[in-house]
Amino acid sequence: KVKVGRFEAYDMFPLNQDTFVEHSGNTANDLYDDGSGYIYMMKEGRGRSNAGGNFLVSKQLDNWYFELNTLLEDGTSLYNDGNYHGRDMEQQKNVAYLRPVIAWSPTEEFTVSAAMEANVVNNAYGYTDSKGNFVDQSDRTGYGMSMTWNGLKTDPENGIVVNLNTAYLDANNEKDFTAGINALWKRFELGYIYAHNRIDEFSGVVCDNDCWIDDEGTYNIHTIHASYQFANVMDMENFNIYLGTYYSILDSDGDKIHGDDSDDRYGARVRFKYFF
């Protein structure tokens, strides 16, 4: 199959049903909020960007699935407000993310998948240093693995869906690792995500909304998230309401000179969905 346009490719960090986690972002845009910590979920090259488009080829061979997604976009759209490690990113050219995925389903319920994503365009964006030299910041390569047990495929009423996800990002002056597990049963979803950020260089950041990261160091984010679905509201088969909430604890190895040692964040959302 060949697909061209603005869409999302294979999900390498599934959170089960409609889930609200503020730090994660929802598309290829604004995923990285400078100073807030980063929950990397293999989304940077997945697509549905408002600053570019996708070209995807895929093939199903028995119980194997192969996919290659190419995302072309303005790479600075990854960053909320265009900032990375306290610097404003300057676009030189578009990025091109290549994102190959391999998935294997030995049974109807169980699937294991592995993937990577990488920007293959050098000097796509960066900053100009004090000597007037352009410093590339667009080198980003991520790896991910996911295992899913979907009991709903054989038991639509009482089946359990469990996801175990891991992801690792190697970027300019930053290394990120994320692991998560979540389960869905009877329309109730509960999950936990651990994210570890290691930042090797930072120029400082100025913001008005309690920036948590403002220096190099190691940072950990622990997040619990939950969701519940009200199905077929008002006896309408395609109308569902989702309640989502999360709570995050952020801690660091800091010395309390460059910001707080810990912080917590939380949120809730109600989403109405009608499927035409």
Locate each region found by the language model.
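Outer-membrane beta-barrel pore domains and translocons
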Residues: 7-11, 60, 69-73, 97, ...
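Solvent-exposed loop/turn segments connecting transmembrane beta-strands
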Residues: 10, 15, 45-53, 73-74, ...
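Outer-membrane beta-barrel "beta-signal"
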Residues: 230, 263-276
